[in-house]
Amino acid sequence: MTDTPPNAATPNAPVPPAAPGTFVIATAGHVDHGKSTLVSSLTGMEPDRWAEERKRGLTIDLGFAWTSLPSGRELAFVDVPGHEKFLANMLAGLGPAPIACFVIAADKGWQAQSSDHRDAIAALGITHGLVVITRADLAPDTIDATEAEVRAHMRGTPLETAPIVTVSATTGEGLDELITVLDEVTDAAQAPDASARVRLWVDRAFTIRGAGTVVTGTLTAGRLRTGETVRLHGESIDRTVSVRGLQSRNSSTAEVVPQARVAVNLRDVPAEELHRGDALLTPDAWPIVDVLDVRRTMGQPLDAGVVELMAHIGTAAVPVRLRAFDAEHARLTLARPLPLQVGDRIVLRAPGSRNVFAGLLVLDVDPPELSRRGDGARRGRELAERPATGDILAEVARRGAVERSVLTRFGLPVPSRSVPETEALPDGVEAVDGWLVHAPGLAVWVEAAKTLVARELQARPMAAGVPVKALSEGSAAGEPAPARGSERGHPPPADTDHRSCRTRDDRRHGETARPLRRSRRGRGRGRRARKTSGRRAVLGSRG
């Protein structure tokens, strides 16, 4: 797939909107099992983009092709490499894809990367897909045995009951049946939400003469329009940019809706600043986080002792540090922040290993600090009770009060204002304008406010009213205060150990700052300081 942008000479020319009903399918399977040949047979296009790939007959990076089914449904294929050396490239192609096409050759059977790719599909939570047995003409007597082998290896995975189709790209055997099954699989897939916020993980970035910088990716939700402004967040860039033009299926379009492979022509962005793993986002709609709490969905126990790992999220690959709470739950600290939400899937891989270590489900993208002994074990027990979609009551209770839009950005299923609050909100949560408030805390605040108002009016009976500032200062001075929150919730009391008091490194590791150990050279100064001040000296940063 070329994914090339509109001609730069006519970036504002009228173009029709992209047709809906497109589905993106990523291939998977061991090297040299016929993935690229299968895609070529279905689409009439060569997915391998590089001369070296065609010369060696080996897919190295992601390839792209598309076709239309007789039903009118459109398919866009992402062809991934099968060789173990290119596992990171495979995960970048499979990560954003909603449907998987698992390929196994009849003449070779199940092999090492077959297991790796199966594990990646399971870790990513891809629940829609099919299995294609290729090269039926080369080993017709092994078809039944290969199918039984596939069923055995897929047991307990999302593709356990996936349809299996046998084909031969050489003779054309089974291709008609495959097209029918592709229609059925895409029909069963969940319809994408075109009204959702955009998060387009970038898999390629390049420059086209006369057009400028282009990025490509898989649009799984939301919509993109020419002329609109989006946020570009990445390894070396984070700013708003303008969409100069769009293209899908090699045709210019004014708008792209999901699902789709899309090329986005960006205005005034140097291509050298962009990398695979960057993301185009709806502005002010995504939390950019580097600390998150997760649950294991498959793979090795999280308390197995491995601390330094590589996390694959979308098309991004980021080093992470893992702090296990128990075998099933942990805290991840990312080497760089990413746009993430509750419900996202992560693949963990040990450095130097070509195997999947574990699959993760994101439970919290704004977790509480863990500064006291035993906090990790307590947090593990809390997360064990948390549903996969997040816990609105727990998030509101921890903060006391939080803006509704904040929890929406986190990915929690906050009910729309059009739904009666009494029916949609959990017990213990009340809606106050654009805020969600913990009901027990609200009662305390109301009583505290009444007390403060009465005191102020008694002290100044001629005053026109009580300033809001007085209420805030009164709370901080010792009156009943809101429950401890985060910087995104209600302001905490003055003595609260607040996240903003931590350094950037402390925030990244999810821990509070600790006093530095005094060197032998500085002990005398410390004793003199204590004598002079009459209180314990606290070592901090210079300044």
Model-derived features: where do they sit?
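Conserved Switch II/interswitch segment of TRAFAC-class P-loop GTPases
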Residues: 80-85, 95-145
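Conserved G1/Walker A P-loop phosphate-binding module
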Residues: 2-80
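G-domain G4 guanine-recognition motif of GTPases
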Residues: 105-107, 129-144, 165-173, 267, ...
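C-terminal effector modules of nucleic-acid-centric enzymes and ribosome-associated factors
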Residues: 138-144, 149-152, 249, 269-543
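P-loop/Walker A NTP-binding module and the surrounding RecA-like catalytic core of P-loop NTPases
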Residues: 25-29, 33-42, 85-91, 109-112, ...
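Conserved nucleotide-binding/hydrolysis micro-motifs of P-loop NTPases
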Residues: 83-84, 107-111, 126, 135-140, ...
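Conserved catalytic-core segments of large NTP-driven translation/proteostasis enzymes
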Residues: 136, 152-300
